[in-house]
Amino acid sequence: MATIEDLLEEVGRPYQMFNEDGTYQGCFYPVQFLYPDKPRYNMPSEDIEKNYLYGLARIKKHCVEIQPEELQKGDIIVTRFRDELHVAVYYEFSKIIHVFKDHTLQLGRLKLFKEYKCFRVKE
């Protein structure tokens, strides 16, 4: 299984919006990289609100919600960014690994988001 350090080595590399099987990858890329045994998500609609609710429901199915002060490496951050679902992986010291500009994996700061939910993947 990949580690958070393996994911960190991917920072700066471009990614594809869709997996080889046609399922949506987008900003889920870091989550799918770390947790390849979890189901992939195929966004059902072009409706931003429906996709946000669908993506959040899928994450809740495989994760348990935690408080921000409980965050550990590999936990998942879910937020709205420009009214769309955005997913990131917590690294450490308020840093996150996520897909952002230019379709590349980037190291960013959690304070970029005003509101977010935190999740830990169920074993």
Predicted regions and their residues:
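N-terminal capping segments
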Residues: M1-H62, K73, F81-L85, K122
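Aromatic- and glycine-rich peptidoglycan recognition patches
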Residues: C63-I66, R82-E123
